[in-house]
């Protein structure tokens, strides 16, 4: 799991790549998002274009991060989901929890709305 961070228009974008699985990526994602929230960043976008696999622990990390962000007055959104991740979110009904976007520009604009 590799996480690259960049800021565009006041939104922290985490470009994730690799696997988000138990012991490999799940804690990294949660810790990075917790750090952003602790630093006062409330608008977080996860770019999942390069995530090739996610297991139940990875899903748990996304849900936990979403809940933590919401509790702290922030928002966490997802962009560039692969077909596999879209299907997984649909099967688990989590697609109704997360705001998801196909394009980064659209996702960034949603934070201003």
Regions found by a protein language model. Give the residues of each.
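Short, flexible, glycine/charge-rich loop motifs used to bind or transfer phosphoryl groups or to couple energy/partner
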Residues: 2-4, 34-35, 109
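Short, charged, intrinsically disordered terminal tails
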Residues: 106-112
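Short acidic-hydrophobic, aromatic-tinged amphipathic segments that line or gate anion-handling sites
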Residues: 99-103
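Short beta-strand/loop segment at the start of cytosolic alpha/beta domains
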Residues: 1-15
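Amphipathic alpha-helical interaction surfaces in cytosolic regulatory modules
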Residues: 20-98
């Amino acid at each position: 799991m590799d996480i690259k961070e960049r800021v565009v228009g006041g939104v922290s974008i985490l470009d994730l790549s690799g696997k988000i699985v138990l012991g490999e990526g799940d804690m990294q994602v949660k810790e990075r998002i917790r750090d952003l929230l602790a630093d006062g960043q409330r608008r977080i976008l996860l770019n999942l274009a390069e995530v090739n696999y996610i297991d139940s622990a990875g899903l748990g990390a996304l849900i936990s991060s979403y809940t933590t962000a919401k509790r702290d007055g922030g928002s966490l959104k997802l962009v560039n989901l692969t077909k596999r991740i879209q299907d997984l979110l649909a099967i688990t009904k989590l697609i109704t929890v997360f705001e998801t976007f196909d394009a980064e520009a659209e996702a960034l604009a949603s934070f201003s709305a």
